[in-house]
Amino acid sequence: MLPCVRGAVQRTEGFVIPHFSFLIQMKYFIIAGEASGDLHGSRLIAELKRRDLEAQFRFFGGDLMAQSAGVEPIVHYRNMAFMGFVNVLLNIDKIFHIRRLAEQNLLDFLPDKVILIDYPGFNLRFAKFVKHNLPSAEVDYYIAPKLWAWKEYRLKAIKRYVDRMFTIFPFETEWFGSRGYNVEYVGNPSVDSVSAFMNEDFDEVQFRAENGLDSRPIVALLAGSRRQEIRSCLPIMVQLAENYLDYQFVIAAAPGVEAEFYESLVGQTRVKIIYGATYPLLRVARAAVVNSGTATLETALFRVPQVVVYKVFGGRLAMLLKPLLIKTPWVSLVNIIAGREVVTELLAHNYTLERTKTELDKIIEDGEVRQGMLQAYDEIIDVLGDVGADARCAEKIYKG
C-alpha cells in the first residue's frame, strides 16, 4: 500500500497510475501506556481524523483516546503502569500477556502506520516486533524517550526500528542530531493543553463552591499519576498542610486512580481531594508541591511557583548512584529546559517534611525567590514556542 501522500504515483508496466490520499483508508495502531499519553493520543487521533475522515484506529490507551477514536482500547493504560524493577518482576506474566495482545492485534489489524507515544520500555520492544513482522508499516514515535537523561543505549534500537521521531522539547533536536539521528521538533503539547484551557470561560467562585473550597489561598498537591509514586510522595504533602492553617491544601487526583486509594492516604486530615480538575486547580493555586514529571512543566505554564519532590527507594544510596544513572543534573522538566535550577528539587532522602516546608515558605509569599521563579517561567514559555504540537505531528504522520 502506498503511503498517504497527495499526488503519489505508482509505475506499472509503462503506465503511471495516480494515487490520492482520499482513496486510501488508512489504519493507525497506537500505543500509549500512561495518562499523559492518553491525552496526547486523543488529540493526535482527533487531528488525524480531521485530515482523514475514513481513518481506522486500534489502540492501547485510555478513555480520552476512546472518545476521540470512537472505539474502546484493547488494553487500558491503567493495566500497563508498572514502575520499578520489583513491580515489573511481580507482574511479569501480565506484562508478557499485554505484549502478546499487542502483537496479535497488530497482525490482525495490519495497520499502515504504528504510532508509539512515550512509554519506551514497552514501545521500543514493540517497534522491533513491528519491523520484523510487518515491515510495510511505518513506525512513528511521538514524544521521544528521554535518552538525554538516562538509558542512552536505547538510541541503537530507535535508529533500527523507528522511522520518524517527533520531539516535544527544543533541545532534543540537537541532542539526537549530534548522535546521528534526525528528529523533528513539533512543539510541546502541554503548551497546547494549557493555552486551550486558559482561553475557556472560567468562574473561580463557582469552582471553589463546587469543590467545597473557601476563599483562602490554595496550595496544589500533585503527587503523580501512578499508585506507587502517589503512595510514596503524598503522605509528606498531607502532613505539610498542618503547618499552614491560613491556606487550603488540595490534591489533584490522577485520572484512573480510585477515590478510595486517595482517601486511605489522606485519612481525617483537612486536605481536600478533587477529581478531574487539575487545570482548574492550578489556575487558582497560589503555590504547588509537585511530584517530578510532566506536571512540573504544566505548573510552570500556569505560572504557579512550585517545589518539586520525588521519593525513590534507596534514599542516600539512590542519590549517590544518581550521577551514574541520570545524565542531567536535574530531574524536573522546568530546570532541564531552562538549563539551570529554577525550582528546588527535593529527591529521595532530601524529601522531608522540614525541607519541603522551608522551600515552600520561600515561594508562598511575595518575595525575590517567587518573582525570580515567575520570570524564569516566562523565559521557558518563550523557548517552547507556539501552540499546535499535536496538529503539526498529525500533519507530518498523515503526509508520510
What are these regions (language model features)?
Residues 3, 23-400:
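Nucleotide-activated sugar donor-binding and catalytic core shared by glycosyltransferases
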